[in-house]
């Protein structure tokens, strides 16, 4: 191997032959070889880490509320349909009782 080419990766894939001085990938938030975080120069670094989680949790709660509201509307529709069925059955029973009483 040519000494000037030592440590150079000539493929589009990362391999395990990258020397230890190469560090982590550039322009991404990741970790170095020791497991410590490496900040990105490109990604936004001024925002607090908890902010996306709080916003995501809030959005998730809103979606859950929408889902619950849809389920409640479906249940209300089903209950109304069942009440109409019960009313129709009660009217049929009333008619049958009148027919039986007339005989």
Swiss-Prot record:
GO terms for biological process: symbiont entry into host cell. GO terms for molecular function: hexon binding. It is found in: Virion; Host nucleus. It holds the Pfam family Adeno_PIX. The keyword Transport does not apply. Keywords: Capsid decoration protein, Capsid protein, Coiled coil, Host nucleus, Host-virus interaction, Virion, Virus entry into host cell. GO terms for cellular component: host cell nucleus; viral capsid, decoration. It comes from the Viruses. Residues 72-99 form a coiled coil. Belongs to the adenoviridae hexon-interlacing protein family. This protein is only encoded by mastadenoviruses, and may therefore play a role in mammals tropism. This is Hexon-interlacing protein.
